[in-house]
C-alpha cells in the first residue's frame, strides 16, 4: 500500500500501477474462466455427439429386438401348440417350482425391504445433501462477499501503501530541509553566540561609558555652577570697582568682602570637588592647589591694592567703558548659559534614553540567549528525531524489499494454485461424468430389478392360471383319459418328435440364456473394474485435495502473519509521519517567531542609528558652541588679566573647564568610535540577515517549484491511471460479455444434452419394456426346473453384485462425508482465523472455491 531522498526529489510511478496490475490479473482470470467454459462446451458437444451415437446404436438394437420379438412371437405360437403336450412335465415340475417359488418370495421380500430402506436412506441423504447444498450456497455467497471485502481492503491497503510511499519521499525531503536548516541554525547559533558575546562586551563598555558620562555630567554641572558664581563675582567686582572710584576706603572694604566671598567660593568648590568620584581625584587636587594659589594671589593683591589705588583712579574712566562692554558680554554669556542649560537638559534626556535603550538591549540579549538555548535543545531533539526517521526509513526500505519478494512469491503461488485449481476442476468434471454414468447404471439396474419383480409377479399369475388350467385339464383328462389312452398309442411317435423338437428349442433357449449370462457377467466385471478405478481416482483426488487444503491453510497462516506485520509497519509509519508533521509545524512556528524577532531587532537598530545620528549632530553643535564659548572666555580672560589678578584666577577656572571639555571631547570621540564599531557590526549583522533572507526566499521558491512539479506529475499519473483503468474496465466488460455468451452457449449445450438424455431414457424405457415382454414370454415358456435354477442363480449373482455395489457405494459415501466433514472443519478454522487475523489473501479464496466446487459436485452426484 507500492514502490517507493538529501535532494528534494520524489519517485513517480510511471507505467502500470498496482490497480492496473490487479485489473490485468482479473482479466487473466476471466480469460482463464472463458477458456474453461469453452473447454466445457467442447466436452459437452463431444458428450452430445457420443449420446447421439449411443441413441443410434440403441435404435439399431431396438430394431434388432423388434425382429427377435417377432421371431419369439412365432415361436410362442408354436409353443402354444406344444403346451398341451408339456402338461405332464409341468405336473412333475410343480413341486420343485413351489419350493423354489417360496424361497424366491422370501428372498424377494427381503430384497424389497432392503431396497426400500436403502431408498429411504438415499432420500434422507438426498434431503440432507440438499440442505447442505443450500447452506454451502449461502456460505459461498458469504465467502464471495468476504472476498469482495478482502479485495476492497487489499485495494485500500495498497492505496494507503502508495500514499505512505509518497509521504515517505516527502518526509525524506523534509528531513533534508531540516538537516540544512539545522546546519544553518548551528552556524547561526555560533554566529549569534559570538555576536551575543560581543554585544555583552559592548553593553559593558556602554555601561562604563554611561558611568563616565554621568561623572562628566556632574563635572560639567559643577563647572557651570562655578561659571555662574564667577559671573556673579564679576558683577560684584564691577560694583566694587564702581565703589572704588568713589572711595578707596570703599574699595578696600569691597576687596575685603571679595576676599571673604572668594574664601567662601573656595570652600564651596572644595565641597563640590569632594563630591567627585575616584576618576576625578587628580582634578580635585589640581583645583585645591589652584585655590591655594588664588588665596596667595588674593593676599598679594591685598598688599598691592594700596600701591595700585592711584593707578586704578587713572584707569577708572577707561574701566567704565570696559564695564559697559563687560555688561554686554555678560548678557551674551547669560543667554549662552541658558542655551547650554537647555542643551544639558536635552543631553540628560538623551542620556536617560540611552540608558533605557542599553537596558532594553541587555534584556534583548538575555532573551536572545534564552531563545538560542531553546533552539539548541530543539535542534538536538530534531537531530534525534531525524536519526529515528532515517532508521525508520531504512527499516521501511528493507520491509518494502521483503514485501516485493513476498508479493512475487505470492504471485507464483497463485499461478500454481490456479493451475492446480484447473486440474482439480477438470478432475471434478470427470468425476461428475463418472458419477452420472454410475447413476445411469444404477437406474438401469433398478429398472432390471423392477423388470424381474414384474416378471416374477407375472410368473406367479401365470402359475395361478396354470393351476386353474391344470385343475380343469385334470378334470378334462379324467374325462378324456379313456379317449387319450386310445390316442396315446397313436401320438407316441408324434410325442417323440415333439420331444425332440422341444429339446432342441430348450437347448437353443439354454444357449441364449447362457450367452446372456456370460454377457451380463462380463458387463458386471467391466463395470466393477470401472467403479473400482473411479473410486481409486476419487481417493487420490481426495488425498490431493486434502494436501492442497493443508498447504493452503499453512499459507493462509503465513499470509495472515504477513498482513499483521504489514499493518503494524503501516501503523508505525503513520505515527512517524504524524510526529514528523508536528515537528515540522513546531519548527515552522519557531522560524516565524525568529523572523519576527529579527524584524524587531532590525527596527530597534534603525531607531538606535537615528538616535546616534541625532546625538552626534547635537554633540557637534555643542562642540561648536563650546568652541565659541572658549573664544569668548579667552577674550574675557585676557581682559581680566589686564584688569586684575582675580580675573587671572577666573581664567584658570576657565582653563580647567576647557580641560574638562577636552576630556569630554576625548570621551565623545571614544564614544563615536564605539558607535561606529557598533554600526559596522550592526551593518554586518544586517548583511548576514539579508543573505539568510535571500537564501530562505530561494529555498521557498525552489520548494514551490518542486511542489508544482510534483502536483503536475501526480496529476499526470492520475490521468494515465484513470485512462488505463477505463481501458482495462472496458476490456473486462468485453470479456465478461464473452463469458456470458460462453455461459449461455454452455447452458444451451447442457439443455441439448439433457434433451438427448431424456430421449435416451425414453428409448431405454422402451427397450426395457421390450425386454420385459421378452422375459415374460420366456418366463411363460420356461416352466421347467432348469429355468428356475437359472433364475435362482441369476438372482443370487445379482444379489452379490448389488451387495458389492451397495457396500462400495456406502464406503464411497462415508469417505465423501468424512472429506466433507474435514472440509467443513478446515473452512471453520479458516473463517475463525480470518475473523481473528483480518482480511485474508487470495489463497484463501482459492481454497474456498475448491471446497465450494467439490461440495457442489458432490451434492449434485448425491442428487
Curated annotation (Swiss-Prot):
Main localisation: cytoplasm
Region Nonhelical region: start-end pairs: 1-18, 837-863
Pfam annotation, one family: Myosin_tail_1
InterPro entries in the record: Myosin_tail (IPR002928), XRCC4-like_C (IPR014751)
Localization of this protein: Cytoplasm, Myofibril; Secreted
Keywords: Coiled coil, Cytoplasm, Motor protein, Muscle protein, Myosin, Secreted, Thick filament
Gene Ontology CC terms: extracellular region; myofibril; myosin complex; myosin filament
Keyword ATP-binding: no
Presence of keyword Secreted: yes
Coiled-coil stretches: 19-836
UniProt xrefs under SUPFAM superfamilies: Myosin rod fragments, Tropomyosin
Similarity comment text for this entry: Belongs to the paramyosin family.
PANTHER family per record: CINGULIN-LIKE PROTEIN 1-RELATED (PTHR46349), MYOSIN-6-LIKE (PTHR46349:SF6)
Protein purpose: Paramyosin is a major structural component of many thick filaments isolated from invertebrate muscles. It is a prominent antigen in human cysticercosis, may have a role as a modulator of the host immune response. It is able to bind collagen and has complement inhibitor activity.
Assembly and oligomerization: Homodimer or monomer in secreted form.
Protein name, UniProt field: Paramyosin
Organism name: Taenia solium (Pork tapeworm)
Gene: PMY
Amino acid at each position: 500500500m507500492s514502490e517507493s531522498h538529501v535532494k528534494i526529489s520524489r519517485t513517480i510511478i510511471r507505467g502500470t500501477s498496482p490497480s492496473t496490475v490487479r485489473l490485468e490479473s482479473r482479466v487473466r482470470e476471466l480469460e482463464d474462466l472463458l477458456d474453461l467454459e469453452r473447454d466445457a462446451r467442447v466436452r459437452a458437444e463431444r458428450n452430445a455427439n457420443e449420446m447421439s451415437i449411443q441413441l443410434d446404436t440403441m435404435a439399431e438394437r431396438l430394431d434388432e429386438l423388434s425382429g427377435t420379438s417377432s421371431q419369439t412371437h412365432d415361436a410362442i405360437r408354436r409353443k402354444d401348440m406344444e403346451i398341451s403336450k408339456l402338461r405332464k412335465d409341468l405336473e412333475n415340475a410343480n413341486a420343485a417350482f413351489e419350493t423354489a417359488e417360496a424361497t424366491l418370495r422370501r428372498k424377494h421380500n427381503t430384497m424389497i425391504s432392503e431396497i426400500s430402506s436403502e431408498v429411504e436412506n438415499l432420500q434422507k441423504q438426498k434431503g440432507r445433501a440438499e440442505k447442505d447444498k443450500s447452506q454451502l450456497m449461502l456460505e459461498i455467497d458469504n465467502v464471495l462477499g468476504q472476498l469482495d471485502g478482502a479485495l476492497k481492503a487489499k485495494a485500500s491497503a495498497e492505496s494507503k501503501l502508495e500514499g505512505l510511499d509518497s509521504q515517505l519521499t516527502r518526509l525524506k525531503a523534509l528531513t533534508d530541509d531540516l538537516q540544512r536548516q539545522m546546519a544553518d541554525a548551528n552556524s547561526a547559533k555560533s554566529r549569534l553566540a559570538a555576536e551575543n558575546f560581543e554585544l555583552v562586551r559592548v553593553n559593558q563598555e556602554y555601561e562604563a561609558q554611561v558611568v563616565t558620562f554621568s561623572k562628566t555630567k556632574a563635572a560639567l554641572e559643577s563647572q557651570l555652577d562655578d561659571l555662574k558664581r564667577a559671573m556673579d563675582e564679576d558683577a560684584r567686582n564691577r560694583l566694587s570697582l564702581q565703589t572704588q572710584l568713589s572711595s578707596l576706603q570703599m574699595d578696600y572694604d569691597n576687596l575685603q568682602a571679595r576676599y571673604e566671598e572668594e574664601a567662601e567660593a573656595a570652600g564651596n568648590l572644595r565641597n563640590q570637588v569632594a563630591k567627585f568620584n575616584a576618576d576625578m581625584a587628580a582634578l580635585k587636587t589640581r583645583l585645591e592647589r589652584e585655590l591655594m594659589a588664588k588665596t596667595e594671589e588674593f593676599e598679594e593683591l591685598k598688599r598691592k591694592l594700596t600701591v595700585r589705588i592711584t593707578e586704578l583712579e587713572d584707569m577708572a574712566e577707561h574701566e567704565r567703558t570696559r564695564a559697559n562692554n563687560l555688561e554686554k558680554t555678560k548678557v551674551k554669556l547669560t543667554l549662552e548659559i541658558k542655551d547650554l542649560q537647555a542643551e544639558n537638559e536635552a543631553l540628560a534626556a538623551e542620556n536617560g534614553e540611552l540608558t533605557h535603550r542599553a537596558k532594553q538591549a541587555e534584556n534583548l540579549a538575555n532573551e536572545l540567549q534564552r531563545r538560542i538555548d531553546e533552539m539548541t535543545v530543539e535542534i538536538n531533539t530534531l537531530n534525534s528525531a531525524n536519526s529515528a526517521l532515517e532508521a525508520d526509513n531504512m527499516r521501511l526500505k528493507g520491509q518494502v524489499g521483503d514485501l516485493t519478494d513476498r508479493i512475487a512469491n505470492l504471485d507464483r503461488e497463485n499461478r500454481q494454485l490456479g493451475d492446480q485449481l484447473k486440474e482439480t476442476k477438470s478432475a471434478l468434471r470427470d468425476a461428475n461424468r463418472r458419477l452420472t454414468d454410475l447413476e445411469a447404471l444404477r437406474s438401469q439396474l433398478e429398472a432390471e430389478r423392477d423388470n424381474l419383480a414384474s416378471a416374477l409377479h407375472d410368473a406367479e399369475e401365470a402359475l395361478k392360471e396354470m393351476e386353474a388350467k391344470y385343475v380343469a385339464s385334470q378334470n378334462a383328462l379324467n374325462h378324456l383319459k379313456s379317449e387319450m389312452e386310445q390316442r396315446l398309442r397313436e401320438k407316441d411317435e408324434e410325442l417323440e418328435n415333439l420331444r425332440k423338437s422341444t429339446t432342441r428349442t430348450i437347448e437353443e433357449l439354454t444357449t441364449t440364456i447362457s450367452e446372456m449370462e456370460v454377457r451380463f457377467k462380463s458387463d458386471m466385471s467391466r463395470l466393477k473394474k470401472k467403479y473400482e478405478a473411479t473410486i481409486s481416482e476419487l481417493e487420490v483426488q481426495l488425498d490431493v485435495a486434502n494436501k492442497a487444503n493443508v498447504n493452503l491453510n499453512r499459507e493462509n497462516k503465513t499470509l495472515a502473519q504477513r498482513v499483521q506485520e504489514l499493518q503494524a509497519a503501516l501503523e508505525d509509519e503513520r505515527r512517524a509521519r504524524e510526529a514528523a508533521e508536528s515537528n515540522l509545524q513546531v519548527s515552522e512556528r519557531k522560524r516565524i517567531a525568529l523572523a519576527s524577532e529579527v524584524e524587531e531587532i532590525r527596527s530597534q537598530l534603525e531607531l538606535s542609528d537615528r538616535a546616534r545620528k541625532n546625538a552626534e549632530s547635537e554633540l557637534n553643535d555643542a562642540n561648536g558652541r563650546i568652541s565659541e564659548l572658549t573664544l569668548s572666555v579667552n577674550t574675557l580672560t585676557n581682559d581680566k588679566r589686564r584688569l586684575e589678578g582675580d580675573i587671572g584666577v577666573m581664567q584658570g577656572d576657565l582653563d580647567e573647564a576647557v580641560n574638562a571639555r577636552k576630556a569630554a571631547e576625548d570621551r565623545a570621540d571614544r564614544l563615536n568610535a564605539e558607535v561606529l564599531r557598533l554600526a559596522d557590526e550592526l551593518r554586518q549583522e544586517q548583511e548576514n540577515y539579508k543573505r539568510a533572507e535571500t537564501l530562505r526566499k530561494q529555498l521557498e521558491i525552489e520548494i514551490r517549484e518542486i511542489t508544482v512539479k510534483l502536483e503536475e506529475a501526480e496529476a499526470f499519473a492520475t490521468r494515465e491511471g484513470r485512462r488505463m483503468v477505463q481501458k482495462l474496465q472496458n476490456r473486462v466488460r468485453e470479456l465478461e460479455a464473452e463469458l456470458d455468451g460462453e455461459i449461455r452457449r454452455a447452458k444451451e449445450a447442457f439443455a441439448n444434452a439433457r434433451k438427448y438424455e431424456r430421449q435416451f431414457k425414453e428409448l431405454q424405457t422402451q427397450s426395457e419394456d421390450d425386454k420385459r415382454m421378452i422375459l415374460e414370454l420366456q418366463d411363460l415358456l420356461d416352466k421347467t426346473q432348469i429355468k428356475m435354477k437359472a433364475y435362482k442363480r441369476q438372482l443370487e449373482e445379482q444379489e452379490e453384485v448389488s451387495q458389492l455395489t451397495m457396500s462400495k457405494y456406502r464406503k464411497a459415501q462415508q469417505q465423501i462425508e468424512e472429506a466433507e466433514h474435514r472440509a467443513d472443519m478446515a473452512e471453520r478454522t479458516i473463517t475463525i482465523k480470518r475473523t481473528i487475523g483480518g482480511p485474508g489473501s487470495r489463497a484463501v479464496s482459492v481454497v474456498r472455491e475448491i471446497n465450494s466446487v467439490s461440495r457442489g459436485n458432490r451434492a449434485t452426484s448425491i442428487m
